[in-house]
Swiss-Prot record:
Protein name (record): Protein PAT1 homolog 2
Similarity remark: Belongs to the PAT1 family.
Task performed by this protein: RNA-binding protein that acts as a translational repressor.
Keywords associated with the record: Cytoplasm, Nucleus, RNA-binding
Gene name of the encoded protein: Patl2
Single GO MF annotation: poly(G) binding
Matching InterPro entries: Pat1-like, PAT1_dom
Keyword Nucleus: yes
GO biological process, one term: negative regulation of translation
Length: 529
């Protein structure tokens, strides 16, 4: 498209005339697609459409204001021609020139075409200022640099027709006309069939399968639990309806049982030879036989057996604790948990021993190890009240021996809170029987076991809690005051108070908790003595 050179707009003397210098010619962005390629000569029209005075000579008020403000005062009225003359070659076809004249200077008889909402006429002073030197630089309005709607429609129809005829147009998606970037194509598309993709996905899902998801996929399980809790809270508040959240469901594939043909001997450093068809060997030959020297050291290996038993019981306890967080139904959870707790209690349950020096007792061996104390403390909340009370009585009866074995570990204090919850379940007869065991004199000793209890923090705390519970039973049940058990209880309290008075104040341990109802009773007992 060439420049417009020497465009002169002339009208009657009452109107205006504008002269544009060739070097300041305007560039037109319009070019028709149907313009002939072999048209080299410029076509110039000497006679332009007549601009009538009535009926708004220029189509756009903005153009009228621009031309009126840019006219030189001395040039007004110099040209009296009634037509607009164009000097110089325009360098465009007659059809293009004719369309440009129609768009800039529409006839009065034809209405002005406006596309889009009507815009107010701009201020003429925006285009020209008196202080601006001549000639000013003009720019055509936006509707002169765009295609005519009819021509743009023809161009779009031709583009659609070309896409239909091209064989590759159907596979390539149509590109938007305003998109400058070419359509992106995936070089790796359609390399795998849908069946192959499903097979790869199935293999990946099998790798995610786990028999213990809480251990293998802990963070995802916790995330999903928080997500379900958040949705449940929103449902309670009425913010949203109940909707199933997306959860990863892996296919279940039963794993075959692994059979180990290797004979393993506990304590051996190497691997025992495997029986094969080339070197047959009976499994009984691989079993180790104990010697007389090993039998003499059975006492030293007894601790190892106790530690092994504690480890096995601890693994069962961990399964019980994990069962509470699995989200299983309450009925199934209670039935399964009660059976596992019963197995653990049967492993700890022993017959009550009157001999305090009985070292072979199973529960005493477990409580002699720090991890065994942790095991019993974590097992107590799962036990029924009757089983927990039996453990409480057993620990109270053997309390002096347990304190002597706890000098190095100092771990008995972790049993105080779990045992303190079941002290209220003791009857008066059970309490009296447990307290009498602390006052028995050991053979060949003049010191009562209660003196050892008073010098230990766990022992004195448990003793004060038992005395407080006994005082509550006596005060709440008037029938006990007239019975023989009440007299025995009074003598027992006096003996304990006497032992406390005999010990120096520095030897008494500081209790973990001091009952409120024990101070008045101690004061009355001390006054009566």
């Amino acid at each position: 498209m060439k420049c417009l050179e020497g465009l002169h707009l002339q009208q009657r003397p009452s109107k205006f005339s504008v002269s544009l210098a060739p070097e300041e010619g305007l560039v037109c962005a319009f070019q028709l697609e149907e313009e002939k390629e072999n048209e080299d000569e410029c076509v110039c029209s000497d006679q332009a459409p007549e601009v009538k005075e009535e009926g708004c000579g220029l189509g756009d008020p903005a153009i009228v204001s621009a031309f009126q403000n840019t006219q030189v005062p001395q040039q007004r009225g110099l040209h009296s021609s009634h037509r607009v003359k164009v000097s110089g070659a325009l360098g465009m076809s007659s059809a293009s020139l004719h369309f440009m004249w129609q768009s800039v200077f529409p006839r009065a008889s034809s209405p002005a075409h406006h596309f889009g909402p009507q815009q107010p006429s701009p201020d003429p002073f925006l285009f020209y200022s008196p202080l601006t030197p001549w000639p000013p630089k003009l720019s055509l309005p936006s509707h002169l640099t765009q295609l005519h709607p009819q021509h743009q429609q023809i161009l779009q129809q031709q583009q659609r027709w070309r896409r239909r005829r091209s064989p590759t147009a159907r596979s390539v998606p149509a590109q938007k006309p305003w998109s400058r970037e070419p359509a992106a194509s995936d070089a790796y598309a359609n390399l795998m069939t849908r069946k192959e993709k499903d097979w790869v996905i199935r293999v990946q899902m099998v790798q995610l399968q786990s028999e213990n998801p809480r251990l293998d996929d802990y963070y995802y399980q916790k995330y999903y639990q928080k997500l379900e809790k958040r949705q449940a809270d929103k449902e309670l508040l009425g913010q949203k309806t109940r909707a199933e959240s997306l959860k990863l469901v892996t296919p279940y594939i039963q794993k075959p049982e692994v059979y180990e043909s290797v004979v393993r001997i506990e304590g051996s450093l190497g691997q025992v030879a495997v029986s094969t068809c080339f070197s047959p060997r009976r499994a009984i030959d691989a079993v180790s036989h104990g010697t007389q020297e090993q039998d003499t050291g059975a006492a030293s290996s007894q601790r190892l057996r106790v530690l092994s038993q504690i480890e096995k019981m601890f693994l069962q306890l961990l399964k019980i604790e994990e069962g509470q967080n699995d989200g299983l139904p309450q009925l199934y959870h209670t039935r399964e948990q009660s059976s596992q707790v019963e197995k653990l209690f049967q492993a700890l349950k022993t017959q009550e021993q009157n001999n305090l020096e009985e070292a072979a007792d199973n529960l005493l061996q477990v409580l002699s190890v720090r991890k065994g104390k942790v095991l019993v403390a974590r097992l107590l909340p799962f036990l029924p009240p009757d089983q927990a009370v039996s453990l409480l009585l057993y620990i109270t009866y053997h309390l002096p021996l347990l304190i002597q074995r706890d000098m190095a570990d100092q771990g008995l204090h972790m049993l105080f809170k779990p045992l303190g919850k079941y002290i209220s379940h003791l009857t008066f007869h059970q309490l009296l029987h447990a307290m009498q065991g602390l006052m028995l004199l050991s053979p060949g000793s003049s010191e009562r076991p209660v003196s050892v209890v008073l010098q230990n923090q766990f022992g004195i705390s448990l003793l004060y809690a038992l005395l407080s519970h006994g005082e509550q039973l006596v005060s709440l049940d008037p029938s006990l005051r007239s019975s023989s058990d009440c007299a025995t209880w009074t003598d027992l309290v006096i003996l304990i108070a006497w032992e406390i008075a005999q010990l120096p104040a520095a030897s008494l341990a500081e209790p973990l908790a001091f009952p409120r109802n024990l101070l008045p009773c101690s004061a009355i007992t001390w006054t009566s003595n």
